[in-house]
């Protein structure tokens, strides 16, 4: 487990998944760090599912969204990942952003939006 004031990153062995739980707004290096560390775990353990808990999420800075799509997504696509799950309430103020990300992801992954992690 990797824990900061911005997020917690966990390897859920029983689900063969990485769980990234956002706690508060961050940008730049603090935003990018869990994706880099998660990518290492994906490679090491052949992880098939990435779960983002956006319950306490935030609207990304545009530069971070560009970085995510240009730098990390190609590496995720080349990895063992098959599924991406977003934990988010139906009435979340960030739903539009998550739906935008989903639109970019469905070409390469199974994508699910759930209100709680089971």
Predicted segments, located by residue:
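Amphipathic, Lys/Arg-enriched alpha-helical "gate/interface" segment within cytosolic domains
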Residues: 1-118
């Amino acid at each position: 487990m990797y824990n900061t004031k911005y997020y917690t990153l966990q390897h859920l062995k029983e689900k063969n998944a990485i769980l990234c739980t956002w706690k508060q707004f961050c940008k730049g290096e603090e935003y990018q760090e869990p994706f880099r560390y998660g990518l290492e775990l994906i490679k090491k353990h052949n992880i098939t599912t990435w779960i983002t808990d956006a319950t306490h999420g935030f609207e990304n800075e545009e530069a971070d969204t560009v970085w995510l799509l240009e730098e990390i997504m190609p590496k995720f696509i080349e990895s063992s990942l098959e599924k991406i799950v977003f934990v988010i309430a139906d009435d979340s103020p960030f739903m539009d952003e998550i739906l935008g990300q989903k639109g970019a992801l469905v070409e390469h992954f199974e994508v699910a939006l759930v209100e709680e992690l089971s």
